[in-house]
Amino acid sequence: MIIVTSNDIPGYKIAAVFGEVFGLTVRSRHIGSNLAASFKSIAGGELKGITQLLHESRREALARLAAEAEARGANAVVAFRFETTEYANTGVEVCAYGTAVGIQPIQ
């Protein structure tokens, strides 16, 4: 599965468009991460617990997007993006979205 942020893929032509696909995950923060974030906001520095939460959430959302695209018969996703939303300082939603397409190498 090729997943790109651009609207085309060099060396390939888009032979079929299967439509918008997305992968979504909503995760709650660990209370320890919330406490650490409170202290770090005063002292400064990376919020490692939140960084890990976002990293894992993006990977899960991307995997779900790829699975949906594959289920529709696509072998690529173009115009790929992430969108992140925080919920009441207790959790985070990560949505990966793009357009599922069928591509063929240009001869």
UniProtKB/Swiss-Prot annotation:
It holds the Pfam family YbjQ_1. InterPro entries: UPF0145_dom_sf (IPR035439), UPF0145_YbjQ-like (IPR002765). HAMAP family: UPF0145 (MF_00338). Belongs to the UPF0145 family. PANTHER family: UPF0145 PROTEIN SCO3412 (PTHR34068:SF2), UPF0145 PROTEIN YBJQ (PTHR34068). This is UPF0145 protein MAB_3451c. It comes from Mycobacteroides abscessus (strain ATCC 19977 / DSM 44196 / CCUG 20993 / CIP 104536 / JCM 13569 / NCTC 13031 / TMC 1543 / L948) (Mycobacterium abscessus). The lineage of its organism: Bacteria, Bacillati, Actinomycetota, Actinomycetes, Mycobacteriales.
